[in-house]
C-alpha cells in the first residue's frame, strides 16, 4: 500500500447483477474516474449461505424483494471463469484488485487464479479462526472491516492474523446502514482505534457522499473509506470508497 497521497478503492460488491460485462464496465468506469483499486466479493454460495436465509426490503435490489436471498444471490453470482476474465481485464486496465473472499473455497480460488493485491475480511468472519488463519497465510495486505464487531473480537482476530504471519493490516471502521446517517459515523473513534490496535484506521460506511472524507484529515487517519451510491449505476452493494492514505 502507498505511504502518501490519495488511494481510492471503488467497491462494486454485487452491483454487477450477475453480468461479467457489467462488472467490467463498472471496473473501467472506476479506473477512468481515478480509482486505484476495485473491490469485489467472491463467494461460493453453497459454502457461504443456508438455502432458507430470508429476503425482504433493502436486502436485494428493488423489485426482487419477493425472492429468497439464497436463490437471488445464487442467480447473480459470477462463475469462476467470469472472475478470471474480470481479473485479466482489470490488470490490463491498470487497476488493483481488492477481494473479499466470503468463504474458504473462494479464498483458495482467488489464490490459485486471481492473486489480488489486497484481501478484505468482514466482521462476520472474525469468529472463523481457520478462515482468518488462511487469509493471514497468504501474506497479502488485508483490510479488516470492523463495523459491527466488538473490541474483543477485533483484538482476537488481529492477534490470530498476526501470529499466523499475516500481511499489512488496515482497519476500516464504520456503522453500515442504507444509507448511514452522518451522525452515526463517529469518525473520532478512528483515532481511538488506531491507538488501541496499532494499525492504520479508515472509515467504511454507507454515507451518501459529501465532504466526510475531508473531515477525517485532521484526525491523522491513515485511511478513510466512506461508501457512496453512484447515481448512474444501480444494483446491490454498489459503493464508491475514497481512501486517504497517511496524510
Regions found by a protein language model. Give the residues of each.
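Catalytic cores and adjacent flexible loops of soluble metabolic enzymes
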Residues: 1-247
Amino acid at each position: 500500500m502507498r505511504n502518501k497521497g490519495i488511494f481510492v478503492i471503488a467497491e462494486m460488491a454485487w452491483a454487477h447483477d450477475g453480468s461479467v460485462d457489467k462488472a467490467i464496465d463498472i471496473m473501467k468506469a472506476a479506473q477512468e474516474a481515478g480509482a486505484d483499486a476495485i473491490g469485489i466479493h467472491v463467494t461460493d454460495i453453497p459454502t457461504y449461505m443456508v438455502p432458507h436465509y430470508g429476503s425482504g426490503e433493502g436486502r436485494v435490489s428493488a423489485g426482487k424483494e419477493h425472492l429468497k436471498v439464497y436463490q437471488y444471490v445464487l442467480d447473480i453470482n459470477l462463475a469462476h471463469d467470469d472472475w478470471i476474465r474480470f481479473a485479466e481485464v482489470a490488470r490490463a486496465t491498470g487497476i488493483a484488485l481488492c477481494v473479499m473472499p466470503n468463504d474458504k473455497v473462494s479464498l483458495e480460488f482467488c489464490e490459485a487464479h486471481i492473486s489480488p493485491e489486497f484481501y478484505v475480511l468482514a466482521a462476520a468472519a472474525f469468529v472463523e479462526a481457520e478462515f482468518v488463519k488462511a487469509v493471514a497465510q497468504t501474506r497479502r495486505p488485508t483490510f479488516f472491516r470492523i463495523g459491527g464487531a466488538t473490541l474483543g473480537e477485533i483484538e482476537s482476530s488481529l492477534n490470530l492474523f498476526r501470529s499466523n504471519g499475516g500481511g499489512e493490516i488496515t482497519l476500516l471502521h464504520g456503522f453500515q446502514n442504507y444509507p448511514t446517517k452522518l451522525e452515526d459515523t463517529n469518525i473520532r473513534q478512528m483515532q481511538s482505534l488506531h491507538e488501541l490496535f496499532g494499525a492504520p484506521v479508515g472509515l467504511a460506511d454507507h454515507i451518501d457522499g459529501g465532504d466526510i472524507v475531508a473531515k477525517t484529515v485532521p484526525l491523522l487517519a491513515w485511511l478513510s473509506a466512506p461508501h457512496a451510491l453512484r447515481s448512474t449505476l444501480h444494483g446491490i452493494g454498489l459503493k464508491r470508497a475514497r481512501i486517504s492514505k497517511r496524510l
